[in-house]
Design a protein with these regions (language model features):
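Switch/communication elements of ASCE P-loop NTPase nucleotide-binding domains
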Residues: 1-53, 277, 281-408
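Phosphate-coordinating catalytic segments in nucleotide- and nucleic-acid-processing enzymes
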Residues: 47-309, 377, 382-408
Length: 408
């Protein structure tokens, strides 16, 4: 079981400097642009730096404009995870770009042999010739562009090189493609200009398959953290396997009926939702026709009921979006339950007033309140810091001081 005890972030995105201790349930609030989402992303990357690829076009913005580098340190009960980010200098950027093009050349040299009668060349000669022609097209302007869109990630004492060189690579390969195919067509005796054109287009298309990539090797992956962006949960959940989906669907149906999330619900799956009218007659509604609030809570439950999240860390981005207050309340109870019973650690951002205040209602059981008094933190993000409140402090601020815990 993995549990975070503290998070320290320096120079990552909008966060200049932040150090917070964490509990089992962590509610992250604050105004826009104070770093709420950045905090969740920092935690995710500290466990799974390979996710840096997901930032693709925005790699250059991951390091705060006022910093030369970013550092994320996450303390857990079993050790420390550290991720450092820095921009490469011109020399390193050039080396990274050349290596990336070399890797690309190695991957397409067989395609060249398939398109042309080039048995007069050995595979090594062919690969070397193609590599030389592509690399000859690299200019200082290309390297400067690559430098702006690349990062060096230092993770657990090892360096990993990540670059988005899409525009520069396309220009280099486009300029080299015609030269390559004409040369080999000439030397192999091919006169088919259509093949030449198709090959050039195919060469560019093949390169587009992996526009943002790690050079040499990727950092190790981790399954300890799940990031759930609830803005996307109105989309139908992706199915995994028949057996796993059947169990998960049954669990969701049981939860919906037991907690009376939807009136008159009788059965649920991702294709149809069955209801029973007052007359006793049953009817079905296609899942796609259900409202966004219903789809959002289904999407969250689908993720939270996954066996892989049990006992691990779940990062929730704005639960409550699209949801009716009744859905929000039941979701909150469910989050408390999985944190309390399964040992799941929750870090969630929110602007939702109902979601926050429902943590302090009289509807909670005594056991739930005792749990929250020991394992709840409200992290109120500010421009360059965070105010962390315990359960009792947050409740006093809400009920006695009448403060807005959203930090607005």
């Amino acid at each position: 079981m993995t549990r975070i005890t503290s998070v320290k972030v320096e120079g990552f995105k909008g966060i200049e400097s932040l150090h917070v201790n964490t509990t089992r349930v962590n509610l992250v609030t604050g105004r826009n642009n104070t770093g709420k989402t950045s905090l969740l992303e920092a935690v995710l990357l500290a466990f799974d730096p390979a996710k840096l690829k997901d930032f693709s076009e925005n790699l250059s913005t991951l390091i705060n404009a006022k910093h030369d580098e970013a550092c994320i340190t996450v303390e857990t009960e079993t050790g420390t995870r550290t991720l450092g980010l820095e921009k490469p200098d011109h020399t390193v950027a050039r080396q990274m770009f050349i290596e990336s093009l070399s890797e690309f050349t190695d991957s397409v040299s067989d395609r060249i042999r398939d398109n042309f009668d080039s048995e007069m060349f050995t595979p090594d000669e062919l690969r070397s010739e193609v590599k030389e022609r592509i690399i000859d097209q690299v200019t200082e302007a290309h390297v400067s562009e690559v430098q702006k869109n690349s990062l060096i990630a230092h993770f657990q004492g090892k360096a990993y090189f990540l670059l988005n060189s899409d525009n520069a690579s396309r220009e280099v390969i486009k300029d080299a493609a015609d030269d390559i195919v004409q040369q080999f067509a000439k030397e192999s005796g091919s006169k088919n200009s259509v093949d030449t054109e198709r090959f050039g287009i195919g060469l560019l298309g093949f390169h587009m398959l992996d526009r943002t990539r790690f050079v040499r090797e990727s950092p190790p992956r981790s399954e300890s953290v799940s990031f759930i962006d609830t803005h996307d949960l109105t989309i139908r959940p992706e199915k995994e396997s028949d057996e796993a989906d059947a169990v998960k669907t049954d669990d969701i149906e049981e939860f919906l009926i037991k907690n009376e999330i939807v009136d008159d619900l009788r059965s649920f799956n991702l294709d149809n939702v069955v209801f029973e009218a007052d007359s006793g007659k049953k009817y079905s509604v296609p899942y796609e026709f259900m409202g966004d609030g219903f789809k959002a809570i289904i999407g969250i439950l689908w993720e939270l009921l996954d066996d892989e999240t049990t006992g691990e860390i779940v990062l929730l981005e704005e639960p409550g979006v699209h949801m009716h207050p009744g859905y929000v309340r039941e979701l909150l109870y469910f989050i408390i339950r999985i944190a309390r019973e399964n040992g799941t650690q929750i870090l969630t951002t929110t602007h939702n007033h109902d979601f926050i205040t429902d943590f302090f209602t009289e509807n909670l059981t005594e056991g739930e309140r005792v749990f929250l008094s020991e394992e709840f933190s409200l992290i109120q993000m500010q421009q360059n810091a965070a105010d962390v409140m315990t359960y009792e402090e947050a409740e006093e601020s809400l009920k006695e001081l009448h403060l807005d815990l959203r930090g607005l």
